[in-house]
């Protein structure tokens, strides 16, 4: 049987039609040298600054130094499996991370990969990690309170939604405790008002894994993990991960800001990010400057913190609040990184070792701490009671230093010292016990209106506990009225509050 020519051509045509061209074009380079988490690569002529590249075995890296004859790449992972001569592929993508509600309740690394063993993350979109901050036109001045639940902070150093407030102090002074209490305090507000929810992001930079695990456990126990994402670049992670984590977390939080929602981000702490960046820069042979930090270390933090903002109505009224943490050495706030971050932020909370060891916790130095947003981030009732307490504590500090020299003090000075000692005692607060706005107003009002003057200093804590228990049970109406009405505390409102506290004071013994 002879094969027909037409048949052959039909078969060939069919084969050609179904031929799939599987050839892929990729721009590749070769590793010249590798070590200390840095790879020098030759041949990636068109690579962009900040572009993600891929090494054999799926290890990722980011191109940071674009030089004439080679590219300096930082490696997001172990450099042990990379050797000289390995091929490096361009991905044609800038470093991006997943974003959306699917991240809430999860623990992720600096690239947004889950590390909590709860399966893959369902993300609505991907966002570039390092983007430009919003301009001047979309912004609005800060005017809504972001309550921390801490008496000393909410009354004297108020934080608003969209503000950047630095928490600064030596190691072991309670910086993370303030940040953690702020996250825990949002639970009651989020439950009461789901439409105005505050989504929290906690970035752990260069911390021990055990510390991060403890923190996550605490958040889960308190039911706060449902609105929180933890981004962890721990001490055992490479420096590029510690450098990238804050930017990645900010990109995740910006999803909420840009969609008319509210987010809070805590960077714990930025001193370690600066150290990681210094390490990378020196290994990339960039010229060192003051304290061996590179010349652009100010820009490192300014471009990060400028992304926290309050947007106006035309842009959805969303907000992103930042609480960066900086660790000082021996109380030296005039070092390079602390002064940089102080100048970028809208205020700072100073924590002092001395106060901490005196038992004043949170160890906030109310004289040096400041909020540059001020009372515009406070409710009416809080504004009314915060003014007098600030003044009285300032006078007390001045007089206390003075009173050490003389013993014969006049009655007015003695009264001022007594009141100041009680107010200082009143500002103490145990960890994990945030108070609502109304409760803080009632407690501080009691302190500034003489209800504590006859109470011994040691009994102030017991008085406060008793007063809060009384208001929560017998006089719920007062707390509800303060929350709903938010009155200015004067005239009838002042009388109503005074009467309620006086009722309790009679029973206190």
Swiss-Prot record:
InterPro entries, alphabetized: ATP_synth_asu-like_sf, ATP_synth_asu_C, ATP_synth_asu_C_sf, ATP_synth_F1_a_nt-bd_dom, ATP_synth_F1_asu, ATPase_a/bsu_AS, ATPase_F1/V1/A1_a/bsu_N, ATPase_F1/V1/A1_a/bsu_N_sf
CDD domains (UniProt xref): ATP-synt_F1_alpha_C, ATP-synt_F1_alpha_N, F1-ATPase_alpha_CD
Family annotation (Gene3D superfamilies): 2.40.30.20, ATP synthase alpha/beta chain, C-terminal domain, P-loop containing nucleotide triphosphate hydrolases
Binding site for ATP: 169-176
Sites marked Required for activity: 369
UniProt keyword terms in alphabetical order: ATP synthesis, ATP-binding, CF(1), Hydrogen ion transport, Ion transport, Membrane, Nucleotide-binding, Translocase, Transport
Enzyme Commission designation: 7.1.2.2
GO molecular function (one): ADP binding
Keyword Transcription: no
Catalytic activity reported: ATP + H2O + 4 H(+)(in) = ADP + phosphate + 5 H(+)(out)
Statement: the UniProt record of this protein carries the keyword Ion transport: yes
Similarity annotation: Belongs to the ATPase alpha/beta chains family.
Record note on quaternary structure: F-type ATPases have 2 components, CF(1) - the catalytic core - and CF(0) - the membrane proton channel. CF(1) has five subunits: alpha(3), beta(3), gamma(1), delta(1), epsilon(1). CF(0) has four main subunits: a(1), b(1), b'(1) and c(9-12).
Protein name: ATP synthase subunit alpha
The organism of origin for this protein: Rhodobacter capsulatus
